[in-house]
Amino acid sequence: MNKIEILTCHCKKVEIELNLENGVEELVRCNCSLCKRRGYVMAKIKLENLKVKRGQDQLSVYKFGKKQLAEHFFCKNCGIYTHHRSYTNPKNYEYNVACIDNINSFEYKNIPVFDGEKL
């Protein structure tokens, strides 16, 4: 059974539909130079299970590093990071768990840290 969740930025100009086939999966934090500054809890999702429903024109993309492979999306208006295309697996996105209203990201404990510092 598919479970649909809606992810929004703070100002609600960006709305993203997540098809969470098995709920929130593969929680992770990252210690790369960008992620350690923003401190978010992220979860993985297949590309086809994330759809921008509203506000595509409100999303900005930020890339960094030598290869600039990961695309980090954030709202132009409120600045909230919503999701990014995975650097290590381009068939996945990782999304900001805290952007789902009915999920409290502070309840998740012992979240593994991806060693993005090496990238």
Please place each PLM-identified region on the residue numbering.
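A short Gly-Trp-Pro
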Residues: 1-8, 13-119
